[in-house]
Amino acid sequence: MRGADFIIVGQGIAGSCLAFELLERGASVSIIDDDWRGAACLVAAGVINPITGQRLVKSWRSSVAHPYARGFYKNLESRLRGKFFHDRKILQLCKSPEESELWRRRAGESGYAEFMSEPPADENFGALDDSFGAHFIGHSAWVEPPAIMRAFRDYFIARGVLEVGAFDFTRFSPEDGTYRGEKFKKTIFCDGWRVLQNPYFSWLPYRPAKGEILTMKTDEFLPEHIIQTLLG
């Protein structure tokens, strides 16, 4: 590993996007990653959803974030020569009359119309139960995390900026900005849940959230949308 403007610890989605942007802006970068051991990005759903939570509220700055994200990922597809970004509506299924009423009220509020809409009358919901109503969330998308991570890795390896291995904290000196004797202007940790094992940040009150993935196969027809319901 050679000295550089930046050393980035972790080649997950955050570290990869940051390294890519820095390289595009002419900075020198070195990345170290432990071969995605336990990386959450490989199992993440990759859903971009501007309307979230049980109260159906807009994500912070969603009107700005989605156009930026779309442009960013489309540029990545061109630069990395891959396909991993898909514009796709979210089909929100209501589980009760109360949820349906909440949707109706929220959709009528200022700033929500561009994100919330009704499906056409001939929409085929297939095996889905839409007894209490089904609605569309727009400006949503699906990103394929494994595909984009592999494309990023090939990109970084081709440029000689990625080292596969564990970061050795005993050979890191933040006081003089060196790692294994090499000089770096900035060190950026993008180590995800492993921040709990990072001696510089482990004191922070993190509470990692653990999810579940269920892979389902069915012969029933399902619409080509991202399908979700509110939790609870």
Predicted regions and their residues:
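Flavin-dependent oxidoreductases
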Residues: 17, 175, 180-232
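Conserved FAD-binding subdomain of flavin-dependent enzymes
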Residues: 21-24, 34-88, 101-103
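N-terminal Rossmann-like FAD-binding beta1-loop-alpha1 element of flavoenzymes
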Residues: 4-30
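Flavin (FAD/FMN) cofactor-binding and adjacent substrate-gating region
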Residues: 78-159, 163, 170-175
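Internal, well-ordered alpha-helical segments in soluble enzyme and binding-protein domains
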Residues: 65, 145-152, 183, 210
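Conserved Rossmann-like nucleotide-cofactor binding loop
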Residues: 14, 37, 194
